[in-house]
Curated annotation (Swiss-Prot):
Its main location: cytoplasm. GO terms for biological process: negative regulation of DNA-templated transcription initiation. The gene is mraZ. CDD domains: MraZ_C (cd16321), MraZ_N (cd16320). GO terms for molecular function: DNA-binding transcription factor activity; transcription cis-regulatory region binding. It holds the Pfam family MraZ. Residues 6-48, 77-120 form the SpoVT-AbrB domain. It comes from Nocardioides sp. (strain ATCC BAA-499 / JS614). This is Transcriptional regulator MraZ. Forms oligomers. The keyword Protein biosynthesis does not apply.
């Protein structure tokens, strides 16, 4: 199952977030929340996170960018699980990193979920939409 769509659930006062019902089955075996690029959070099913971890570890640590990526990915990671109500707990340091308050935007990005502050999402999305509109000659996922 892929994660698709945009949702606007709310964080409660304890940092718990209801995830869309259609996302929950894929996370039943566990999840990992990490810092993402552009100051969002990434929610990975545990098995997908482990694949990402293997890729990160396969890159020689003599490559500075690989070291930086691994440090950010693993140091900020928080293992978790859905509670009986379908919520995940987002640790305070992760909420602070992403500037999350009560209002959040949750987006499905195929194999992972991203959680955004609404203002940051609108700013990022506006720029990304403009770039997307310019991709009429070559799909973004292909190389030169």
């Amino acid at each position: 199952m892929n994660f698709l769509g945009t949702y606007t659930p709310k964080l409660d006062e304890k940092g718990r977030l209801f995830l869309p019902a259609k996302f929950r089955d894929r996370l039943a075996e566990g999840l990992v929340v990490t810092q993402g690029q552009e100051n969002c959070l990434v929610v990975w099913p545990t098995d997908v996170f482990m694949e990402e971890a293997r890729r990160a570890q396969a890159t020689p640590m003599t490559v500075r960018g690989a070291r930086d990526y691994a440090r950010v990915l693993f140091a900020g990671a928080d293992e978790g699980a859905l509670d009986k109500q379908g919520r995940i707990n987002i640790a305070a340091p992760l909420r602070e990193y992403a500037a999350l308050d009560r209002e959040v935007v949750v987006i499905g990005v195929m194999d992972r979920i991203e959680i955004w502050d609404p203002v940051r999402w609108r700013e990022y999305s506006a720029g990304a939409q403009a770039k997307f509109a310019e991709l009429d000659e070559q799909p973004a996922h292909t190389s030169g």
